[in-house]
């Protein structure tokens, strides 16, 4: 039950990245993402990892939907499938991709950071629960 939103997210994201779905309509991509993350937040509001994951996704979807269906990114000059240049007319620029990543040459948004932290916490909680169950079964 807890993995359902993550699996749906991976499916939609994979369909976009690998098969090119939503390239002609990024607005629908971010609308689906918004609805998916909102659903995740409602179902799992007590789980801090999934809640942070959902809030990050909602932040990314909102800034993209408000700015015409594409995520504004600092430093680019052309419009790509889901990205557009950040300008003076960009709404909520603090939620756009502008944070320099320590890995490679990627730019991150505040929502991306929440997504990563949320997934990390969710996995740590899951592994801790697995370890606890295993420890109880073999009586360490």
Please place each PLM-identified region on the residue numbering.
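Structural signal for the C-terminal ends of transmembrane alpha-helices
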Residues: 1, 38-48, 121-130
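Aromatic-anchored segments of alpha-helical transmembrane domains
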Residues: 9-18, 56-66
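Extracytosolic (periplasmic/ER-lumenal) interhelical loops and adjacent juxtamembrane/interface segments
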Residues: 72-109
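Membrane-interface loop-to-helix entry segments
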Residues: 23-32, 105-117
